[in-house]
Structure formats: C-alpha cells, structure tokens
Curated annotation (Swiss-Prot):
Signal peptide extent: 1-23
Compartment(s): Secreted; Host cytoplasm; Host nucleus
Stated family: Belongs to the RxLR effector family.
Free-text domain note: The RxLR-dEER motif acts to carry the protein into the host cell cytoplasm through binding to cell surface phosphatidylinositol-3-phosphate.
Induction conditions: Expression is induced during host plant infection.
Lineage: Eukaryota, Sar, Stramenopiles, Oomycota, Peronosporales
Record's function text: Effector that is involved in host plant infection. Contributes to virulence during the early infection stage, by inhibiting plant defense responses induced by both PAMP-triggered immunity (PTI) and effector-triggered immunity (ETI).
Name of this chain's protein: RxLR effector protein CRE18
Domain of life: Eukaryota
Motif RxLR-dEER, residue range(s) on this chain: 47-68
Amino acid sequence: MSKLFYAFAVLAVHVLTSSPTTAASNLPVNLVTGPAFTTPAGAAHRRFLRSIHEGEDSLKPSAFSEERTALRAMDYLLKPKHKKLAAALKKSTSKHKLSVAPEKMKSIQVLGDPKNPEREWFKRLYNSKRGDPQTLRKLGQFKTEAQLSRYIKFYVVCRTCIACYSSGRSDSCHRTPRMVRTVGVGCRD
C-alpha cells in the first residue's frame, strides 16, 4: 500500500512541475530559455557568457585579448622547454641508426666465421665448468676488455639458446636463422 502511495506522490510532483502554467511562471529563473539569454547581433557568444556586469562594455580591447594574453603567457613559460625538446629531437634524428649498426655488428660477425679461432676458444671456455664470464675474468683468461665484452655477447647468445632447448622450444627458437648464422651458435651448438 505504501509503494502505491509513493508512486502516486512521484507522479503528482512530475505532473505539477511539467504543466504549462508552471513553466511560464519559472521563465525568469530558467536562463537558457529566458529572453535575457539572447545575445545582441554581432556579439560573440563567449564574451556574452563572460560578462560580469550588465553595464560592462564587451567591445573593449581587453575583452578581445583576454585569451590571447593567457596564451602569450603560456608561450613565454613554455618557450625554453620547447627549445630543449627541439634540440633533443634534432640530436636524436641527426645520427641515423643504420650508420651505427655496422659498428655494433662487427664483433658479432667476426665471431660468426666458423674458422675463427677466437670462436672455437669461446666455445671451449663456455663448455668448461667455469664458463661464467665473471669467473673467467677473475682467473685472467682474457687479455683485453674488448675480448671480455665479445665473450659476454657470445655467452648471452648461448645461454638464451640453451634456455630454448631445455624448455622444449628448440624447433621454434626465438632467434632467426640469420642470427644463428651470424653468431655461429644455434640451439644445439
């Protein structure tokens, strides 16, 4: 019974608020549909909404340049950041990645030669009980740091391939055949 009463009360309130007499009496309150909301001919809608007083002259130059002043201030603050960003982008695009690639691949391509004695020596070191690069470095196996860095690259490639083989993914190795030929170490090598 109480649900029926509440439904009737909601319906009555809705009917009373949507009647034409109520809408006509609320006309000055409703600013969107009221006559005070209309803009004069030639005046911008934005400026009309911003006017604070009725007597304010909306055609003053300050009203026109309000947004421009704010944007100029933002540009003034952001100009150093834009310069730094442009310099960083120019620096990053000036050195092309393909010009650096041969330098980085040179040491790996040398190891890919099957007749390379260093490659064979790296294989023997890797297959020994102490194949870890840091252990071999402590033992003094490497003459130069460049030789150590080449062995570390060799070691990383071998370790990832053994991980593929031990996980049962040797037929679908994560490396491409070209990479296997270049480095000279496959999953079962």
